Amino acid sequence: MSVDRAWIDANVKWKEFGTGVRLGRLHREDSTSLVLYDVVSDVEVDAFMAHNHPGGEVYIVLEGEVWDEDGTYPTGSIVWMGRDTTHTPRTRGQTLILVLWPEGVKAA
């Protein structure tokens, strides 16, 4: 899978969390959000907090690898989390994830 990082960096407004994770909001309409997560390769293992998805979550791993309590998802994986699912994702390597939250996200 090829990702044009130069285009992404030129067109996405990033919010830095100071943990090696940054969030780019691509679109928001009512409670639905489409975002990018960009994670550095040497991020702390607990950079992501446990969180809940009231309306579920779908994400595509564009680069790197994501893993959580339910499995490991390499580049190219499309992952669906059902309504009211709680998880604590982790990443391996430089990771870029495209995420859709139909009804937002809440800290667990």
Where in this protein do the model-derived segments appear?
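Conserved short histidine dyad/triad with adjacent acidic residue
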Residues: 22-53, 67, 71-75, 82-86
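Short, surface-exposed beta-edge/turn micro-motifs
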Residues: 56-58, 94-95
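A short, N-terminal "cap"/entry segment at the start of jelly-roll beta-barrel domains
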Residues: 1-34
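Cytosolic regulatory regions built on CNB/CRP/Popeye-like sensor folds
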Residues: 1-5, 69, 108
